[in-house]
């Protein structure tokens, strides 16, 4: 045996060695497992064996066969088609939101909506609820043409192909720049033609956006004012319940009102009761039995005088402070079911289909008669700020009158049942809400400046009353068949904030406290229920308010 660098190399011909000419160091292998000759280790023993094993690990032998070539890279990239919703697999699973996180989430969503409205002019509510677009969503964003003549820009994400397409087809369907001209400049001649009409329109309409002094657009203002009160809690029970035996269950009557003097008037059969909001004392103002019964009540806007409509068609004015009648006015031939004040003018609607305007300072019983309705007038509401009167009747008609004109300014016939519930918004000019009866079951909101309907809400039950909040941009509705509930609505989103339950029959009557903090509801179950819904912003003093019955006031 020869020695080579401390390794013993066999010289026997029975041991076959495979040599590789490409290696600078030849490695000896024993390919004959049944050979009688074994490798002999020199006298250094185990040390050489360990050194050889380390040397073999450092210089592995070349393989006898070439490795097959593979088309795989050094990283694994999965192949997925475009229909795979990757965002669903990687979306963080949200746990239950704490009150703080919920408010933060609502604030973030509102800010995102506001920012989108300012940048893209989009106020679509669907974006608020789905911040991540799914692969099947088609998103369209358009920028309106400006006066510089730049044409519209349209960015569209196409619907991805189905899962049967291969990865090569996915690359072909990748969104690309549209082939149309992105920036298209008009010639000076065309530009003058296109801008002439716009300039004329701007000059004719002072309400254009370019004349606005607000840092945000009008659409964004509506979004800000329509902030949702999702976390708001409404009372589950009323804070006071009063028995009202004999409270009529007639849909066409108005037998409950809360005056600025903080006194609640309610008619039970032929008697009128006064409940003091300060001392909670109850007083009987008058008993009309047996000659007549009460069909409507309405407090004057300032002062302690109460208007009372009767079944015989007369209208009486009472001083609640002294419980004495000041005057009686005739004019109707049948019962008076609706009353409404506009300063010193009292308007009354009767079953004779007529509306009468009365100046309580003048000796005449009335000075104007409106005859547009074809059936009983059951709803009347003045907008004193704009001198507009809204009337609703059993002929399913809603009419808007300009001051004391004999013909209506607008006549809406969109309801399919009697219109008793009417209320004006104290926060926006010309916004009117109306509600229909059992066959209609809808609340409709109108823009009386344009004569158009803004919203149509299907409530699922008879709408008996509507009343706008003095403190917040919300309105209350009371319902009869089949829900018998009280609902609170947000405007302009017209979303339901909450529901008040407790009455077991139709909620036919509704009134609000003078400070706008509480409401009282009356139902055919002969109960009056008091609810605290709003926070009072200011305190009103009845002693400092002037009355239209003040002798120092002059007749205009």
From Swiss-Prot:
Residues 126-146 have a biased composition (Polar residues). CDD domains: WD40. InterPro entries: Cdc20/Fizzy, WD40/YVTN_repeat-like_dom_sf, WD40_CDC20-Fz, WD40_repeat_CS, WD40_repeat_dom_sf, WD40_rpt. It comes from Schizosaccharomyces pombe (strain 972 / ATCC 24843) (Fission yeast). GO terms for molecular function: anaphase-promoting complex binding; ubiquitin ligase activator activity. Keywords: Cell cycle, Nucleus, Phosphoprotein, Repeat, WD repeat. Residues 12-37, 159-169 have a biased composition (Low complexity). SMART domains: WD40 (SM00320). The modification Phosphothreonine is found at residues 98, 177. Residues 1-80, 126-173 are annotated as: Disordered. This is WD repeat-containing protein srw1. Signal peptide: none annotated. Gene3D superfamilies: YVTN repeat-like/Quinoprotein amine dehydrogenase (2.130.10.10). GO terms for biological process: anaphase-promoting complex-dependent catabolic process; mitotic G1 cell size control checkpoint signaling; negative regulation of G1/S transition of mitotic cell cycle; positive regulation of anaphase-promoting complex-dependent catabolic process. It is found in: Nucleus.
């Amino acid at each position: 045996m020869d020695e080579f660098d401390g390794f013993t190399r066999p010289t026997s011909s029975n041991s076959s060695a495979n040599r590789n000419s490409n290696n600078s160091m030849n490695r000896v292998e024993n390919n004959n497992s049944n050979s009688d000759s074994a490798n002999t280790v020199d006298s250094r023993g185990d040390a050489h064996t360990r050194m050889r094993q380390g040397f073999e690990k450092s210089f592995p032998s070349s393989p006898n066969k070439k490795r097959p070539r593979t088309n795989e890279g050094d990283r694994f990239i999965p192949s997925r088609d475009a229909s795979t919703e990757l965002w669903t697999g990687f979306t963080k699973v949200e746990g239950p939101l704490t009150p703080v996180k919920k408010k933060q989430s609502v604030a973030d969503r509102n800010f995102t909506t506001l920012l989108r409205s300012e940048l893209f002019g989009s106020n679509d509510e669907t974006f608020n609820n789905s911040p991540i677009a799914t692969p099947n969503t088609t998103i369209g964003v358009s920028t309106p043409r400006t006066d510089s003549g730049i044409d519209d820009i349209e960015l569209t994400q196409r619907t991805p192909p189905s899962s049967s397409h291969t990865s090569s087809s996915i690359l072909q369907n990748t969104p690309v720049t549209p082939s149309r001209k992105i920036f298209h400049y008009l010639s000076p001649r065309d530009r003058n033609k296109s801008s002439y009409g716009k300039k004329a329109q701007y000059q004719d309409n002072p309400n254009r956006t370019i004349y606005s002094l607000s840092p945000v657009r009008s659409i964004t203002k509506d979004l800000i004012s329509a902030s949702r009160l999702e976390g708001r809690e409404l009372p589950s029970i009323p804070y006071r319940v009063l028995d009202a035996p004999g409270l009529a269950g007639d849909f066409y009557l108005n037998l409950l009102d809360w005056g600025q003097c903080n006194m609640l008037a309610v008619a039970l059969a032929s008697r009128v009761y006064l409940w003091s909001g300060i001392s909670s004392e109850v007083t009987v103002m008058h008993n009309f039995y047996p000659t007549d019964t009460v069909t409507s009540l309405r407090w004057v806007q300032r002062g302690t005088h109460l208007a009372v409509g009767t079944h015989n068609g007369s209208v009486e004015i009472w001083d609640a402070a002294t419980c004495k009648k000041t005057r009686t006015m005739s004019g109707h031939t049948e019962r008076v079911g609706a009353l409404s004040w506009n300063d010193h003018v009292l308007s009354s609607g009767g079953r004779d289909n007529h509306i009468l305007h009365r100046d309580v300072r003048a000796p005449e019983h009335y000075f104007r008669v409106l005859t547009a309705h074809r059936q009983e007038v059951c709803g009347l509401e003045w907008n004193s700020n704009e001198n507009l009167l809204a009337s609703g009747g059993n002929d399913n008609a809603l009419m808007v009158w300009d001051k004391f004109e004999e013909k209506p300014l607008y006549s809406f016939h969109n309801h399919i049942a009697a219109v008793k519930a009417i209320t004006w918004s104290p926060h926006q000019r010309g916004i009117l809400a109306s509600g229909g009866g059992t066959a209609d079951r809808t609340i409709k909101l109108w823009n009386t400046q344009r004569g158009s309907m803004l919203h149509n809400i299907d409530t699922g039950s008879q709408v008996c009353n509507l009343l706008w909040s003095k403190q917040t941009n919300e309105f209350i509705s009371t319902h009869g068949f089949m829900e018998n509930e009280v609902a609170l609505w947000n405007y302009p989103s017209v979303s339901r904030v909450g529901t008040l339950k407790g009455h077991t029959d139709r909620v036919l009557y509704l009134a609000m406290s003078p400070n706008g903090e509480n409401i009282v509801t009356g139902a055919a179950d002969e109960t009056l229920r008091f609810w605290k819904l709003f926070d009072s912003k200011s305190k009103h003093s009845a002693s400092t308010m002037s009355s239209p019955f003040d002798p120092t006031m002059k007749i205009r």
